Amino acid sequence: MILKRATYKAIKYACLKFHYAKSVPVNVFGYSVFNEEKEWCGVVLFGTGANHNMGNPYKLKQGQIVELVRMALNGKQESTSKALSIALKLIKKDLPLCQLIVSYADVDQGHKGIIYQATNWYYVGTSLKDKKDGSFIVNGKRVHGKTLFDTLKKYGLKRNLENVQKYLDKNATEYVTKGKIKYLYPLTKDMRLMCESLSMDYKDIII
C-alpha cells in the first residue's frame, strides 16, 4: 500500500462519491491511498477542523494540532487501519510542528471508532450529546444547516426553524445529535503523557 499527497480533484471526487457526508471540507490536505495493485482507493484527509480553538484545551496553537476529518475510501484498500497508520506517520514527517491529532466517531451514523481503536488512539469521551448541531429534519431527511442557509439566503431569509417550516416543510424540526466520540492521537512524548491522563476505557463507549 502506498500513500501520496492528494490533489484537490482527488479530494473532491472521493468526498462526494465515497463518504456518507457527500460534502468537501474546507482547508484540508491529505493523502491518496493506492493498494498493492496500484489502484486508487480514495483519500485520508486532515485539516484545522470547524473549531479554530480546538487546541485550547491542550494549550496548543494552530499548526500544532490538526483534525482527521475524512477517510473517504472505496473499499479497494487491503486494510483501512494500515492506510490510516501510514497517513499518521506521514503527518509527523510533513507537519513537524504538529503535536496532536483529534478525530470524532459520529454516533448518529452508528460509528463507534473501531478504526481509531485499531490504530491505538486514546478515547477521551463523548461531546455534543443531545445537542442541536445546526441541521434540520426536512421532509423526513436530515439536512445540513449550511445547505438550508444557502437555500434561504437566495430569498433574503434567515436560517431559523420558523422560516424552514414556513417555506420548506411545515413539520420540520431541529436535529438533536446523539453526539460524537472523541479520540486523540499524540505525536510527541508530552502529548502522549497528557492523552494517557485523559484516556478512558474503550469498553465504556456506549452507542
Locate the predicted segments by residue:
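Short hydrophobic/aromatic beta-strand or adjacent loop that forms the aromatic wall/cage
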Residues: 28, 178-183
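Acyl-donor binding region in acyl/amide transferases
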Residues: 5, 47-170
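Short amphipathic alpha-helix that is part of the acyltransferase structural core
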Residues: 1-26, 39
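Short, cationic low-complexity segments
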Residues: 196-207
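Short, P/G- and charge-enriched loop/turn segments at secondary-structure junctions
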Residues: 18-21, 167-173
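Conserved beta-hairpin
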Residues: 15, 28-45
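An active-site-proximal beta-strand-loop segment
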Residues: 20-28, 34, 53-54
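Short, charged low-complexity linker/loop segments at the C-terminal edge of domains
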Residues: 188-198
